[in-house]
Amino acid sequence: MTRFVGCIDLHDGKVKQIVGGTLSSKPDGEAPVTNFVSDKSPSHYAHLYASNDVQGSHVIRLGQSNDEAALMALQAAPGFLQLGGGVTKDNCQYWLQWASKVIVTSALFDSDGSFQLQRLREISGLCGRARLVVDLSCRRASDGASWTVMMNKWQTPTTLALNEETLALLSEYCSEFLIHAADVEGLCRGIDEELVAQLGLWAAQLRGDVRVVYAGGANSVADLGLVKRLSGGRVDLTYGSALDIFGGSLVRFQDCCAWNRQQ
């Protein structure tokens, strides 16, 4: 059934909420649009999620200079949080010393955005399928009716389409998908209902142990019920800028935890 999943986004060593589409991979790129900068430590949020048993919550390193902050969060709740951002075949096992799973994205593609299945096979072999999440964050394609997987902080389109065939193929090597709708991420203007419904249809065809998590635009605790209805309970939901723990005024963290307890 649809559950609330927590996130801890790290940027420049601090817990932040950023409008996802404004991140840049260029050293001289413009500063991202930031909704919230926390005065609390990453470990504070790790304890918060762990003490409320918000399973599947993740830490994402958005750019450089976040290793120390990521370790602080992971070591505050060993084996509880997932870790994403800059995960490669060379460091995945290092992070799995403290993370429950690692999340991989750009490492699966060449610099031009061409998907490399062999890279996924290699990382899956190192981590184990059960401890690997593939991030298929996406933008709507120019036709308006399909989605393209993005990499490099959602700035670079890849050759991979987000569809049933892609999920079926990749699920042989991972146990979970994390999908940010980059077009609406951080805007608090509502979820991409069409994408959530499609994810539910595609998830129904996957192995029973595969989890699908959607992120982007959620602005009400009622969105949990909406995602449950649209996806048939096959897709989980994460909140960011709308949450009170991230300075938001639209969604109470404890209401989301109460939803999980009721499911």
UniProtKB/Swiss-Prot annotation:
This is 1-(5-phosphoribosyl)-5-[(5-phosphoribosylamino)methylideneamino] imidazole-4-carboxamide isomerase. Pfam families: His_biosynth. GO terms for cellular component: cytoplasm. It is found in: Cytoplasm. Belongs to the HisA/HisF family. Gene3D superfamilies: Aldolase class I. The lineage of its organism: Eukaryota, Fungi, Dikarya, Ascomycota, Saccharomycotina. Its EC number is 5.3.1.16. It is an enzyme of class 5 (isomerase). GO terms for molecular function: 1-(5-phosphoribosyl)-5-[(5-phosphoribosylamino)methylideneamino]imidazole-4-carboxamide isomerase activity. GO terms for biological process: L-histidine biosynthetic process. Pathway: Amino-acid biosynthesis; L-histidine biosynthesis; L-histidine from 5-phospho-alpha-D-ribose 1-diphosphate: step 4/9. It comes from the Eukaryota. Keywords: Amino-acid biosynthesis, Cytoplasm, Histidine biosynthesis, Isomerase. It catalyses: 1-(5-phospho-beta-D-ribosyl)-5-[(5-phospho-beta-D-ribosylamino)methylideneamino]imidazole-4-carboxamide = 5-[(5-phospho-1-deoxy-D-ribulos-1-ylimino)methylamino]-1-(5-phospho-beta-D-ribosyl)imidazole-4-carboxamide.
